[in-house]
Amino acid sequence: MASKRIIRMSDLLHTTPVFNRGYRFQWEQAQQSYVILYPEGLVRLNESATLILKQIDGKLTVHDIIQNLSAQFPDATGLDQDIVEFLKQAESRQWICLQ
């Protein structure tokens, strides 16, 4: 089991999320949704998770992702915290790595 690391928010904003080896984000026709595929199975994603994970390209930082989604959804409140919490959960599930 991966150890839980603590990252300050200011440091987290400058990390770049990338998908871990063995985990693939893709549209799954049979599920009619985006999924995370991994050797043991798949996880069907909701719309919010999909919007966040679509931003992961190995170049954008967490701050960039927050800025992009905030521009798409200017009336959303608490978006930055929601994105950060989701990315932390995705990392704890080993879907992504925050570099």
Swiss-Prot record:
InterPro entries linked to this entry: PQQD, PqqD_bac, PqqD_sf
Keywords: PQQ biosynthesis
Organism expressing this protein natively: Acinetobacter baylyi (strain ATCC 33305 / BD413 / ADP1)
UniProt-listed Gene3D superfamilies: Coenzyme PQQ synthesis protein D (PqqD) (1.10.10.1150)
tRNA processing keyword on record: no
GO BP terms, alphabetized: pyrroloquinoline quinone biosynthetic process
Protein name as catalogued: PqqA binding protein
Pfam families for this protein: PqqD
